[in-house]
Swiss-Prot record:
The record marks K11, K219 as: Transition state stabilizer. It holds the Pfam family AA_kinase. This is Acetylglutamate kinase. Substrate binds at G46, G47, R68, N160. GO terms for cellular component: cytoplasm. Catalyzes the ATP-dependent phosphorylation of N-acetyl-L-glutamate. Pathway: Amino-acid biosynthesis; L-arginine biosynthesis; N(2)-acetyl-L-ornithine from L-glutamate: step 2/4. The gene is argB. The lineage of its organism: Bacteria, Pseudomonadati, Pseudomonadota, Gammaproteobacteria, Alteromonadales.
């Protein structure tokens, strides 16, 4: 991949944080891209760590339509797990791979506007792009921002944002190419086979059939939103698959292409 000005927005799932080899492989891929002049922005969740921390504090995890319900009393624990532990674990892996990274959250640099998404979800945020100055400065230095999905409202209230939706807002902000990486190779059909390409109508049909549901529904709808906004395909792929990462580094299509 030659030097270019486009930004590759990599969203990584929380399950990655529990796989040291997967993290090392992904960061090596990112390091190779950065060395080639490709700007890389990483956005992460940390669901597994959040679940562990909540359980350790005697609290339970409740999800509604694939989104984590966030009561006010859970917010400090969720913020600590995402903006703290998860972010620093990924930064540590980046440092080990020789990457200069900047750990940040959606609350930094006036990057996004945040509001309550749905009262039923508690302190769950919906974010829209606001000011790209801070992010663009970091990217122009050849550094890699590693952004957690904790946002802040104008009154200082912290909000928990779904990481796929956070990556969507940041991809729009920097005009980047979005790749949603999880622990599955892409969107699978009812028989567990990889679907290579999907458009809005096909997605709606698969949601109706119950083939795409919960977290994957949130992921695919976030991907479709960016695909339509940018007028280009968004990839849903796996960090577990070394061959997908190599193809990704070469700028090739991997996983499922969500078409505008």
């Amino acid at each position: 991949m030659s030097t270019n000005n486009s930004v590759l927005v990599l969203k990584v799932g929380g399950a990655l944080l529990q796989c040291e080899m997967g993290m090392a492989r992904l960061m090596d891929t990112a390091a190779a891209m950065l060395a080639n002049g490709q700007k890389v922005l990483m956005v992460h969740g940390g669901g597994c760590l959040v679940d562990e921390q909540l359980a350790a504090n005697g609290m339970e995890t409740v999800k509604l339509e694939g989104l984590r319900v966030t009561p006010p009393e859970q917010m400090p624990i969720i913020a600590g797990a995402l903006a703290g532990t998860s972010n620093k674990i990924l930064q540590g892996a980046a440092t080990k791979a020789g990457i200069v990274s900047v750990g940040m959250s959606l609350a930094d640099g006036n990057t996004v506007s945040a509001k309550i998404k749905d009262e039923r979800l508690g302190l769950v945020g919906e974010v829209t792009p606001k000011d790209g100055t801070y992010l663009k400065f970091i990217l122009e230095q050849g550094w890699m921002p590693i952004c957690s999905s904790i946002a802040m409202m104008d009154d200082g209230q912290m909000l928990n944002v779904n990481a796929d939706q956070a990556a969507t807002a940041l991809a729009k902000l920097v005009g980047g190419k979005l790749v949603l990486l999880s622990d599955v190779s892409g969107v699978l059909d009812g028989k567990g086979q990889l679907i290579h390409s999907l458009n809005g109508k096909q997605i709606a049909d698969l949601v109706k059939q119950g083939v795409i549901e919960k977290g994957m529904k949130v992921k695919v709808e976030a991907a479709l939103e960016v695909a339509q906004w940018m007028g280009q395909a968004v990839q849903v792929a796996s960090w577990r698959d070394a061959s997908q990462l190599i193809a990704l580094a070469k700028g090739e299509a991997v996983g499922t292409q969500i078409q505008p």
